[in-house]
């Protein structure tokens, strides 16, 4: 009765107005699952490939009709009739049918939509929430959010080189309280920026995108906003950065054009070390470029005992790249983006590999999102303790926070908010 009976795909829009793939999987029992895939702006060179049509007459070449046709054609032919609960077998079949090392033939967007929709259908067939279906009875940790309240880099049209400035409400007792704390600080930040004459338009991930001159200025505004909202930076709330350093790494140089600074790897490490000394920064993502393994080792040796160093473009949710990084002693955490690797099984393997090595895992959205809230369930299912899903505005971001609040209510007294347990040192 849990056999896959039908798969329907369609082209929908993401939060940037670009096409993406949505899939409905229906089982013989009548149970259904639906999933829509996200898309990134700053993408790692080693990510699985999302398939775009390239037809300039539609969506500027960004259409996904080829991916849709693969879902309803080759993919359905390959997995139709299979038991939806056999997730690993289904994902292995998808990988085999694609036949490429980076999922470039069928497209990671087509494969992931099917993989996630299948898991949701199986959960619905069993009558349990997705987080419980995937994580079992031990899925009970509500993650600390990394809330991106100031956007820069590729996520905004402003001079700030660093892509994301985030807050983490580590002292909140529950996820619902954490969301409230974040929303109050976000509102206070809007007032502070406006009073200083800055615009309060928001970027791709819902954070403000003011024309600030430096990372230090952005962090100073966030510090003031926390205090105005009644919270203590470093005690109630900690800070996190996503540098997306690959985006400003040119010809062996880290070129912070907005600040007028250029560094080699050692200089970039000193720059980040200085910021972490001035502000309560407890997590830095992609502080160095995706293939600068030597620089990453220096960063890890310098800051790794007290700061969480997250590999996003460095690891691209790929268990093999993660294992390589672990062997070299680089970074101490992985950012988990389901569309970077293209199947649910490989995503879960990446989290498991990280945890076995003592690395933290942070479940993450992409800058081009939809109303799909699957990553909220995945964060709880894996007990990863942290989630990165944007600011406190734009419904594509708040959908994930709202789902976490629902999960917390569902867990009742068995749920626990990760809080300060995520901190190093």
Curated annotation (Swiss-Prot):
Major location (coarse): cytoplasm
Keyword Transmembrane: no
Alphabetized InterPro entries for the sequence: Enolase (IPR000941), Enolase-like_C_sf (IPR036849), Enolase-like_N (IPR029017), Enolase_C (IPR020810), Enolase_CS (IPR020809), Enolase_N (IPR020811)
EC annotation from Swiss-Prot or TrEMBL: 4.2.1.11
Any one GO CC term of the record: cell surface
Function according to Swiss-Prot or TrEMBL: Catalyzes the reversible conversion of 2-phosphoglycerate (2-PG) into phosphoenolpyruvate (PEP). It is essential for the degradation of carbohydrates via glycolysis.
Annotated source species: Granulibacter bethesdensis (strain ATCC BAA-1260 / CGDNIH1)
Enzyme class, UniProt record, top EC level: lyase
Enzyme active site: 205 (proton donor), 337 (proton acceptor)
NCBIfam families in UniProt: eno (TIGR01060)
Residues that coordinate or bind Mg(2+): 242, 285, 312
Residues engaged in binding (2R)-2-phosphoglycerate: 163, 337, 366-367, 388
Pathway assigned to this chain's UniProt record: Carbohydrate degradation; glycolysis; pyruvate from D-glyceraldehyde 3-phosphate: step 4/5
Cofactor needs: Mg(2+)
Gene Ontology molecular function, alphabetical: magnesium ion binding; phosphopyruvate hydratase activity
The protein's name: Enolase
Family designation: Belongs to the enolase family.
Catalytic activity field: (2R)-2-phosphoglycerate = phosphoenolpyruvate + H2O
Pfam families assigned to the protein according to its UniProt record, in alphabetical order: Enolase_C, Enolase_N
PROSITE patterns listed in its UniProt record: ENOLASE
Listed GO biological process terms: glycolytic process
